[in-house]
Amino acid sequence: MSVTDEPLLSVDGLQTSFYTEEGEVKAVNDVSYQIDRGERFAVVGESGAGKSVTSLSLMRLIDDPGRVKGGDVTFRSTSAVATLARKFPEGVATENSPGYIHVTELRSESGAVGSDPGATVRDNPTDVATSLHDGSLHIEAGHVDVLDASEDAMRELRGNEIAMIFQDPHTALNPVYTVGEQIAEAIRKHLEMDDGAAKERAIEMLERVGIPDAEERYSDYPHEFSGGMQQRAVIAIALSCDPALIVADEPTTALDVTIEAQILDLLKELSNEEDVAVQLITHDLGVVAELCDSVMVMYAGKPVERSSVEELYYEPKHPYTVGLMSSIPRIGDDRERLDTVPGTMPDLVQLPSGCSFHPRCPYAEDACLEHEPPLVDVETGEPVEDPDPAVHSAACLEYTGELQDGVDFDVQIREDAATDGGESV
Amino acid sequence: MRRVYDSEALRRDDDDPFSPVEDDESASRNHVNWTNLSHALVPQAIRSRAIAVDVETDKDRYEPGEEIHFGVTFANRFPLPITIVTETPKSWEWSIDGNPKGSEVPADHPEDRSTFHFSRSERKRFRRSWSGRVRVDEKEWRSAERGEHTLGVGIDAVNGAEKLRAETTFQIE
């Protein structure tokens, strides 16, 4: 399998807990997914479902008392492998020594290099280059184990290869530095440009995210920007170093709908034209329909449904997803009141036995109290070991044949609303 | 209009007790971090005696399938801050018949030590409940058998853990 066939990011069995006096808060509990190059992947769920903690874990931004307890995060980018191998040769894995930088295929000017490419890279770190640059050793395939990487290596990855757009631009921007300086800082750090070149690129970035008169606005402070412009400045910081993956944590929650549409268009354009993968965290299913290719629904720190966006909207399989869908207000809807998912998210210190959703599920039976459903293929009922985006999977006993009465809901797709993914459940 | 700098709000005077002092170095010299001092001076053996542990269920008898609600209290008997060093980051744990959180699946807490801190004479109260179902596997539970069950609470302290435990019993009928 060549490197481009493999997903850019694989998250496998991720577990993150916060140890508080109340007990262990299991914020992320065995989450697996993968994102391909240029794919737009959504993580949706209520507040407290573990969406943001999942993203912060893969960026290694979990602070005490939080701990990433288990799992693997594999990031397959040859440029990331090349940069890290050059700067941290001691982290390159060889046949005899472990490491977090794995070089699986290496070429030199004369052809493919020996049986242990890791050792070759470790011995010649200065020669390591990607195929884009001149150099005697080209890394053709490799990956980085993000959770094992050193703190210095993570600082190289963050912002450069994996960028994050934070939820609230007011707190993400530093009020005492100009907006331009905050963008230029990331460029100077990662792209090793001098002050003048970094400023030029920062202005280019501001123009790109649609800030008018970017040259003038470069030296404005964040308070001189409107909310939408601040969010665009945060996006400009994220884009400034041409990342391979952008993790966007509710990027449009603080914005009005017209600016939201512009920001979504910008993210779409980036992923289409530059093959940037986007992991979008949101609780707005409308945004998911607008932007994303595939989606994972989370509940109480676990994935409950995973599928392509079309299948999720037209054929939701998990009762929680159905509940979320039916709580979306729609124009022309003649219902007196919106349906809601009754109750609240369970306390993550003591999760209910069996299926975590059973206390709120209208279809819950005795079996749901004693068996926790694994994520299964909804067609075959077979557990899904490898998170394959093409397989529609849901964690409900309905699909393992253990429910007696089954789940029973209708999805009606209205012709007039079908264009914006509208249906009522 | 009176400006803020005309208000003398920032007037500093060492002799006037109602205005900020010119030099606040003396104030910082008086500051003692009692938590750290107590942690340094109180012997380990006394620390585990200082904390009283108590656990109480809301009833003595429960129907099968009924949720068991209970309260846990940790009280610092000393008028000094006490810090207990724990084996794992988990400050305390409850168990049913010796199974942590009613689960036969072993817990997997990281093996790095942490601390459980009490201010002087502090009482910490926690409310918890148990569903009455024993976790027998990662994804399987079964109803608890009828009869007497023991609910235990303890701090997994590095020193004197045996003193930092409490137990109670209840019946499922």
Task: Enumerate the predicted regions with their spans.
Chain A
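ABC ATPase C-loop
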Residues: 233, 238-240
